[in-house]
Amino acid sequence: MTIAERWQEIRTGFQPTFWVANTLELFERLAYYGSKAVLTVYLANKVGLNEEAGQLAGLFNAVLYSLPIVAGVIVDKYGFRRSLMACFAIFCVGYFLIGLAGMEYGQSITEAIGKRNYVLAVLMLTAVGGSLIKPCVVGTVAKTTSEKSQALGFSIYYTLVNLGGAIGPLLAYRVRADLGIEYVLMMSSLTSLLLIIGTFIFFREPGGEVGEKKTFGKVF
């Protein structure tokens, strides 16, 4: 296949919702990997959790990466669009609350609850919301590509995931240097807010064959 033929396939071989979903994924990955790049240092030095910071950051990632199989049940029930909006809404609140822990405005709340308890609660909230993203976007890619274009579709998806993973920490470094480490989390929260709006305006529930509905009983 020539470069011109490949470009033509990329340009015409996918439904609009495919590109919307992948654009949402790109910016979600920018927000996630940006916050992940500073999370342990932020919790240790800015919030003051010291040696507990690594444990909490590790637990956050473990929960985030282990829940999508269960989150798929929710996505099956409520659809991609509503699940994406819920995901970004939880991310928006979660990143904001994590960032609040390192700001003067949040000190009274964290001191009242206890820093560790507060951070653990908001990290788990954020992880639960984040678990919804992968079933939504992967499912959308599967439903908006044909058998012929599916391999290319997933290649584009993983390329954008990797691109977000590469650029996110670089942007986080600039925000940290210019504004402060806590504002990396606030920028991730703002990005998530914009993703809610983008999903509401541009994302359309993809058609395609309806598979067997999953339930929690079937998953476990």
Model-predicted segments: where are they?
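Central cavity-lining transmembrane alpha-helices of secondary-active solute carriers
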Residues: 58-73
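Glycine-rich segments within core transmembrane alpha-helices of 12-TM secondary carriers
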Residues: 64, 151-176, 191-192
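C-terminal ends and interior cores of transmembrane alpha-helices
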Residues: 89-114
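Symmetry-related core transmembrane helices of the 12-TM Major Facilitator Superfamily/SLC fold
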Residues: 182-201
